[in-house]
Amino acid sequence: MLTKDEIENAIRFLLRKYHAESALLFGSYARGDATPESDLDVIVFGGKHFKKTNIFALAEDLQEITGKNVDAFEISEVDPNSAFYDSIHREGVKIA
């Protein structure tokens, strides 16, 4: 099973590749209770140089690198008034 540091390094590499500003890792890997079956949950803060269509390529690349299923979203896709938004900001681990 990949360590949290290995996952964070893979995300950093992909943030640079796709010109995104930062990301939040959330879910079981952020909480430290991931199992071998856990997926990766990532919110991307794209910024002005990030093409929103690249979120799919970033997720595919992360899945290929880690061998994990990946749920990735660009922050603009998340309703800021939702419980989901609050949850990712409360438990998320920032990666830049």
Question: For each predicted feature, which ranges?
Answer:
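Short hydrophobic/aromatic beta-strand micro-patches
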Residues: 43-45
